[in-house]
Amino acid sequence: AIPSVNELLTEWPVVKAAGETCDAVVHAAVTAELDEERAAIRAGAAPRSKRDLASAIEWRAHRSALPSLRPAVNATGVVIHTNLGRAPLAESAAKAVAEVARGYSTLEYSVDTCSRGSRKEHAAQLIRSLTGAEDALVVNNNAAAVLLVLATHAAGKEVIVSRGELVEIGGSFRIPDVMAASGAKLVEVGATNRTHLADYEQAITPDTAMILKVHPSNYRIEGFHEEVGSRELAALAHKHGLLFYEDQGSGALLPDDILVRGGEETTPASVSAGLDLVSCS
């Protein structure tokens, strides 16, 4: 007969596992192991002894209690790999994080005024210095930034985007879906491979809130192709009293020869070009 849950909970390996993890983890391990045991017996396998079941439960409990986030070896050939944590922290940066995280900190306290401060200011002041922007805000990722920008500045209003920039990025980030979630109204202009300045201007109505330019990220259109640059779109938006917002995708804070050869703009360059809003990750 299959041992009961109570019987297994008194076995030493299970008792030991409960002391090293917690009761909830052990109870879940017992339930899962018994479910597997019943399925195996129905399939014709011989029943395991109580001791074997207890050892299996101990192993399962310890395994389920392990952190799911752990170091990995990146052998993919992709240096900045989204699924593997993107850019590793420098040793000095990791040390600085650990130094602050192991105790109390001035997260939301201003030493200058001896009063409550702003938790966003720590990163914001650094980003302002790096980019020349008037202000900055750090959120979870660029997808969150896009949603927040659209919901804040264009909910219930129209946002003009080129058809060739209605991209889908890994993790099911799709521009039309994010637009719908924000409450903004998507206005597609141009063709998939060619969009002209006149296409944007002709789409402007009294309900237009902004013009959006989206970086295509890991795909490109080649051959018979044309797109409008950010500076031209910013000038058009300002001519009509609209906001111009550039979703840079990954973005880059510092210039790099490879980026320059690829025709990529850095975030500081976009800010200095007069763009109203820029987001990147």
Residue map of PLM features:
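Long amphipathic alpha-helical segments
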Residues: 1-64
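Long amphipathic N-terminal alpha/beta scaffold segment
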Residues: 43-89, 93-97
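Short glycine-rich or small-residue beta-strand-to-loop segments that form or flank ligand, phosphate
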Residues: 79-83, 110, 160-162
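Short, flexible active-site-proximal loops enriched in glycine and acidic residues
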Residues: 64-75, 104-114, 135-136
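Glycine-rich phosphate-binding segment of PLP-dependent enzymes
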Residues: 30-31, 35, 75-76, 86-112
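Conserved PLP-enzyme active-site core in the AAT-like
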Residues: 114-281
